[in-house]
Amino acid sequence: MQHDGSFNPEARFDAVLVGAGIMSATLAALLHELDTQLRILLVERLEAPALESSAAVNNAGTGHAANCELNYTPIQADGTVATAKAVAINTSFERSLEFWSSLQERGDLDTSSFLHQAAHISAVWTPENIAFLRQRFSQLKELPAFARMRWSEDQSELTEWMPLVMAGRDLKQPVAATRIDRGTDVDFGSLTRAYLMPLQQSGALSVEYGTQVHDLKRLRHSDMTEADWRVVLKGPSGKKEVRAPFVFLGAGGGALPLLQRSGIPEAADFAGFPVSGLWLVCGDAQLADRQRAKVYGKAAVGAPPMSVPHLDTRWVDGKRSLLFGPFAGFSSKFLKQGSLLDLPASVRATNLLPMLQVGATNFELVQYLINQLRQSPTQRHEALQQFMPTARAEDWTLSVAGQRVQIIKRSKQGGRLQLGTEVVASGDGSLAALLGASPGASTAVTIMLEVLERCFKQRLDSDAWQQRLQALLPSIHEDPHQDPQVLNRMRERSDALLGLTA
């Protein structure tokens, strides 16, 4: 390994990105678009990109636009539903579509490799849940983002919308659904590779696969660049040192241990709660072809957000697939290919109490996970039959999904389980990490714009970067939720370039 006196200047980069998933790939693409001269290094512990949570079969949900995911509009004490989170997620997904459209327009991205249209449907079948869905529909329908949402309780129409859900169902059972035709499925594994390949081929991005971060330390010696991070990598050829003024930790569940290792004070506020997942995957191609929508149901009480049950049309490696789940479970690993010691190794004096407080105050979640762990194959099949009454056990196989690490955050009120994602950045903006899970990938562009705002603020405010950003995201300084004309303009452009229909 190189030491200070013999440090090779070629091993100094403008940015080191850890984890070759959709987040780091999006950040690499944005940074290169804003400054083609930046030297960027991507480090990945596995042998190829997008093998953890970004992979199509590992992702808990794809194409999240809050059209059908009922957990983004929770019921409130007065009987109405909260809509702010749904609007924010929808706006973020429109921003992703806008970015992909710009790259597609220039011929720099083939969106047909990862983006497919699939209707987004919410379906429920108990009086209580139907009342909830009706309230949700009545409120969202009034918002520009969801104005084209449709409602139905008509058996024949519902059969057209979701034939597998309605086939064999008791005609006396009340069923209601909402539908948005302009929904999508996104293969984020394919998108990750589509971002990275041209950057690698052009020499704008250096990649180290089969390599992990062994040490991460801020350099403050007088004879060195003041702002640099010293990153020691351990790969097939041993250890080596690289340096950079900026480090991004986008390694999914692996981001928390690296954030803790960085020593920045902001890391002390966080702990992680890992949740694993399982899918039932349909092996009958004819059945998969009949289902042309994502059908989301209502989550059980206490269920984490990545465990909302759905019958999911999903493209995996270019092939239409049909999945049901995900069923939640528990593993102390922070990554699917991680270590059982990940959770205990993350415990610190600063986060032990918040973790215990979350365990004591989230009994419903703990009980839910225990019940999920106890599920037999028969019970999982019965859950599938609630969605698809004619489902046969022999047509479905069990597949392990990706690992999620929910955020536990220390606050004045004690530890709390925080849903969603959060960017944690050092005070000087030299290091950022992304923690959390759903909706994640679908909002990657918005999340990485936040990283740029917090870590590259001076350059982001420059005329050069603003002009380039405006070219990539024409509506970047406008709010589509507040101005329906802006939303319509965004959607018309994206739909034309991406081949989406309303």
Swiss-Prot record:
Belongs to the MQO family. Its cofactor is FAD. It catalyses: (S)-malate + a quinone = a quinol + oxaloacetate. NCBIfam families: mal_quin_oxido (TIGR01320), PRK05257.2-1 (NF003606), PRK05257.2-3 (NF003607), PRK05257.3-2 (NF003611). GO terms for molecular function: 2-hydroxyglutarate dehydrogenase activity; L-malate dehydrogenase (quinone) activity. Signal peptide: none annotated. The gene is mqo. One of its GO terms (biological process) is tricarboxylic acid cycle. Pathway: Carbohydrate metabolism; tricarboxylic acid cycle; oxaloacetate from (S)-malate (quinone route): step 1/1. This is Probable malate:quinone oxidoreductase. Its EC number is 1.1.5.4. Transmembrane segments: none annotated. The keyword Cell membrane does not apply.
